[in-house]
Regions:
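Radical SAM [4Fe-4S] cluster-binding motif and immediate context
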Residues: 93-94, 98-198
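Glycine-rich beta-alpha loop elements in corrinoid/cobalamin-binding modules
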Residues: 1-91
Length: 198
């Protein structure tokens, strides 16, 4: 419901901008959301990293031939047109770490406090990042199953992925399946990198 109320304001402020929907709802119901939100130009279906990179190239070169970009649902006069489906990213470890230095972090920090834990609630410089995609279950009614995730050493270990966190006091690693044994290289690694808050 929120996108329907925000979309007219966004379009009013940026009348010439390319306005793209995305996320879970858009992925499962692309034509419905384009009907519901007439201000949207198109919908990105599924993972957006590679799709948006190609969209930037199209816009940057002035071509705007979006039918050549995989993973989109486009408006086609009164109908809709799907481009070739986008394949899932085979290795999430290749996805760059968030570039915190490019974000206006103070805007996000205003909403840092959420009641997930005492530590998070008291934080004033906090961001959330999601480190896995999909679901480990195989429900027959689901349109998609299967998991892809970032190696835990790249989440909790030292190195480039930790460097950006100096700008943020807490970065929550949102992970719905951290308890699965296959997630952890060793039991010691799990003990050294998990702190449970009661």
């Amino acid at each position: 419901g929120r996108i329907k109320s925000l979309a007219p304001l966004i379009r009013k402020c940026a009348p010439d901008a390319l306005f793209i929907g995305g996320g879970g709802w858009s992925t499962y119901n692309p034509t419905e959301i384009l009907q519901l939100v007439p201000q949207l130009d198109m919908v990105c279906i599924g993972e957006g990293e590679e799709t948006f990179s190609e969209l930037y190239d199209q816009v940057g070169t002035g071509k705007r031939d979006f039918e050549k970009v995989n993973g989109l649902c486009l408006r086609d006069k009164e109908n809709f047109k799907f481009t070739t489906p986008r394949a899932l990213i085979s290795d999430l470890n290749t996805v760059p770490y968030p570039s915190y230095e490019l974000l206006e972090l103070d805007i996000y920090f205003r909403y840092s406090s959420i009641p997930y834990s005492v530590e998070a609630y008291n934080a004033r410089r906090r961001l959330s990042t999601v480190w896995e995609r999909g679901c480990p279950r195989g429900c027959t009614f689901c349109s998609h199953n299967g998991m892809s995730r970032i190696d835990l050493q790249n989440i909790y270990g030292d190195g480039d992925r930790k460097a950006g966190e100096k700008l943020v006091r807490i970065t929550d690693k949102e992970n719905d399946t951290f308890q699965l044994p296959a997630r952890w290289p060793t039991a010691e690694y799990a003990v050294n990198n998990i702190k449970l808050l009661y």
